[in-house]
Amino acid sequence: MKRAIVVVIDSMGIGAMPDCRDFNDIPECNTLKNVCKFNHGLNVPNLAKLGLGNIQDFEGIAKEANPIGQYGTMKEKSNGKDTTTGHWEMAGIVLKEAFKTFTQTGFPQEIIDEFIKRTNCGGVLANCAASGTKVIVDYNDEHHATKYPIVYTSADSVFQIAVDTDMIPLETLYDWCKIARKMFDDLGVTVSRVIARP
């Protein structure tokens, strides 16, 4: 075989992992089952033909007597639950140590100070775990007044930088992201992703 194509439906969980409480999840979590229940079914005939409905009882997804694909659920060996950890494991990389998250407190002041120093951005706003749409709305006026980037994280191991590209050029945002990536690597802080949010 010359090539394999892997299609991932990211964040479509089908039940909790045994270590769910280590990552502040509840044992009852099941994204697909809850989406099916909320919508009173789900019209996914091709996934049903592949055997998706045979994994569990999902409202509106039929069981397939003769599926055209292989189906099942998997349990990660890696220590972690974020997108990157799962994708890396599918490619054969098992992480013994989870990527660092900053969900409870935001990033330590030393990291923020180092980011400000390396980028010469003058300061940052937010520095908390937040929904991207909400944090941008909450800090929009202050962002326009100061031109400081909005820096935030989530439940995943991410350092996200949001700016209004009418004020801060897109190329500057990308440069700041490259600087942040190198900074985390230099400091030995295992942050999975640095994300630009123009």
Where do the PLM segments sit?
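Generic enzyme active-site microenvironment
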Residues: 8
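Extreme N-terminal starter segment of soluble prokaryotic enzymes
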Residues: 1-5
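Hydrophobic faces of well-ordered beta-strands that scaffold small-molecule active sites
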Residues: 149-151, 194
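Extended, H/D-rich, highly charged conserved domains that either
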Residues: 157, 163-198
